[in-house]
């Protein structure tokens, strides 16, 4: 694909401006409902906000049948949300993203619930329970949302309690023994207060057999709930409080190995993709809770004073058979927990002035703890040390090695006994303070100038112990002055950043705006609290890293045409990242790997997004979106295999093109007092690389002939559909649904694990089922 540029938008803008002249007048009296968002922390029409935004409302959530945040990414241009395990959820926007692999490394996309930051990767994949809409903001959002939104932000807006007694019950059943039961009740307490409670319980069997244990991996077992309270305390003071929780516990699949543990040869125990042979079932357990208190006070001068207090806690436990084999060679057990307190104050001006503005103060504190073990299994000596010693690939440090017992060899080369651990323990305490301003000045009837800035300061204090004494030939380091007697690393760092933003909007007519926007953002620096090679740790390489920054430029159009029956939004962008933080598994040779985080690169992303919704008739709507992307390392010396120059390579997880196309058709059935609904969606993402090397195949770590397919995920197209019958009084609905109807079976992800194993993550197969809904 040739590099997209702002000129692409120019032709599109010209065509759209001409569209009203060519459109025939329509007097049918039906239009697409106006979309309202709070992307700038005040209620505005979507077309008036000079930011590239996608909105997924409650109807779209219900009709597509998506249940988790990660499912939304398929429908939104230039957005990827990982579908692997929830412990390391990754959101990528415009080619830029990162999972918070350890507690010292933050993500690049902020995920919020009603404006409150949910936290790091284990908390990201929220259930879409009782939501009004999902807003996806593309591009840096540093002015209003602050740190770690260099790629964008996602805000889940919940449906607030209202003054009517009503509720909803639904039951969903499908193949793979899928079952979901949901309930919602909204209860008026008096004329000034109301409450709501929503609950969802989801279960689904796995679809990847583990032939050693007899279990099926990649199952779902999730309980989600949300309680909300709204009080009109006085005519001027409104109180909104909420509590939400999510508990999940299931057998997961990190990857289906296509090589042995060290990538010396192909996988022998279960070579068929989609079947594994592990000695135990990997597991992912999450307990995520959040509380919010929102106080809104309408002042006599027309201003609004707002206080938003949030507290969120996440406990995540993750285990994996890291040898990917039916015997107990080595395994991992990770436990991370996060406690987050945030407080925000906002002063918001009236909406009808020439100058509208908002002042804000923000405080954020996160206490993160980690407890991670690599455990040498009971079969480690017999099935790892022994075979390598017998083949001559392990040589004890003796002048003329005699034939030694395997356990002696293991001890001589530095491994601990079976059951011993290589571990890291620690905590990171983050304190962040910010003050911000955002305003819009109406220059004339057609021109508006937007401007804002945020000043942030953030400190991180780390107390961390890495003990690699039992790691043998893998040479994991140990913290402290004496690696033979590890002691904690105690350190701190502070980042400060000024993030300005400016925009200019021109109203072409009453229904069409074009805008240009500049915005800056930053991702905070931190500490790489991971398994670092001993030599690199001693040299202080890849341990502490600096903040990264971004400057972004965007040109867009948002308009309504054909008398309000066609909405079209376009955006083109270019963003330049400096000191880009790269998190890599680095192969050091000889079976040694190090996990590095460095400010190693300069990155440029360019592209465009287009979204359209057309109300063809009163009963028929078409929707489409397109994303074009070119995300490359402008400069990344030493970023490839064996220190090769990765400059000019594409970023991982950045497909050149993504699109979605769908239609919704209603058929009235007056005799039944009901209506048929038919919805079909097609989603597509191009192939993309998974490493900075941009490889498509790699050699074995031995003389084994041939290569291993690794480094690129194939393009993927899915077809989803729903056929429903719903009563005209909205009392009941019965629907049949199907997802991935063509049974697309190409792997959806891949990885190279710490010891060298290359593994693929099989796609979710075709799923289908029936949903029953009762509203009261």
Where are these regions (language model features)?
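C-terminal beta-signal and adjacent terminal beta-strands/loops
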Residues: 576, 683-700, 725-776
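Outer-membrane beta-barrel translocator/receptor signature
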Residues: 106-108, 120, 127-138, 143-210, ...
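Outer membrane beta-barrel strand-and-loop segments of large Gram-negative receptors
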Residues: 23, 332, 336-347, 393, ...
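Outer-membrane beta-barrel domain signature, strongest for Gram-negative TonB-dependent receptors
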Residues: 192, 214, 219-358, 364-370, ...
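Solvent-exposed loop segments that connect transmembrane elements
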Residues: 208-216, 253-277, 321-331, 373-423, ...
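Gram-negative outer-membrane beta-barrel transporters
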Residues: 357-358, 445-449, 571-576, 598-693, ...
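Acidic, small-polar-rich N-terminal luminal/periplasmic segments of exported/outer-membrane proteins
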Residues: 28-164, 555
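Membrane-embedded beta-barrel scaffold of Gram-negative outer-membrane proteins
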Residues: 290-300, 304-322, 507, 513-519, ...
